[in-house]
Amino acid sequence: MSFDVDVTVRRGERAIVCRFASAGGITALVGPSGAGKSSVLEALAGLLRPEAGRIAVGGTVLFDSLARVNLPPEARACGVMFQDLRLFPHRRVLGNLLYGQRLAPPERRFLSLEEVADFLDIAPLLGRRPRTLSGGEAQRVAIGRALLSGPRFLLMDEPLTALDDARREAIIAVIERIRDELALPILLVSHDRADVARLADTVVELRP
């Protein structure tokens, strides 16, 4: 499934121009802080309306300023993992996962809760609160919630930030398994070029 992006996104007085096409696998947006990486990811998710341009994923047009197409986030079938994870602190891990599952209509569900818990090795965490999780555990729960939403593709904003080496390796392995075993195309944002060199099939450079 391909990403086909040609958009201008505005943040305040600054226009961020991003153009790329990738054939699937893992696509990485790289660049220094302030380059607009997260803004482009939000545009794909439908959380930020581009000023102009077109976004298509797997041949489905998500946004087209000329054709006046702008699908709402819930119609884009994308799983989003935010940099701050955004787990609900008042819900246990199970509740966070079930929230993701409820976002997916039955016809889009390709993994059960049990399958996701096994795939990510988070079954022992289901009864815990997010505040009791390590960084790596919280990352896996956030990935699980995204997978349970029945996505056609995943958007991941700095999924390896603030992890020690062991937890970083564990999350890298999860991302690789999602690509290889679930065949989900992934767009990830990263500032770490070593991680990008290891993971990405396509690299898109953004400059401030």
Residue ranges and their predicted role:
Residues T60-F63, R108-L125, E176-R177:
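Conserved ABC ATPase "signature" region
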Residues L62-G79, L103:
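ABC ATPase NBD coupling module
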Residues R91-L111, F119:
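ABC-type ATPase nucleotide-binding domains, specifically the catalytic core motifs of the NBD
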Residues R129-L133, E137-Q139:
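Conserved ABC ATPase signature
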Residues L148-R152:
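A short, proline-enriched helix->beta-strand linker immediately N-terminal to the Walker B motif
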Residues L154-E158:
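Catalytic Walker B motif of ABC-type/P-loop ATPase nucleotide-binding domains
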Residues A183-V189:
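Conserved H-loop
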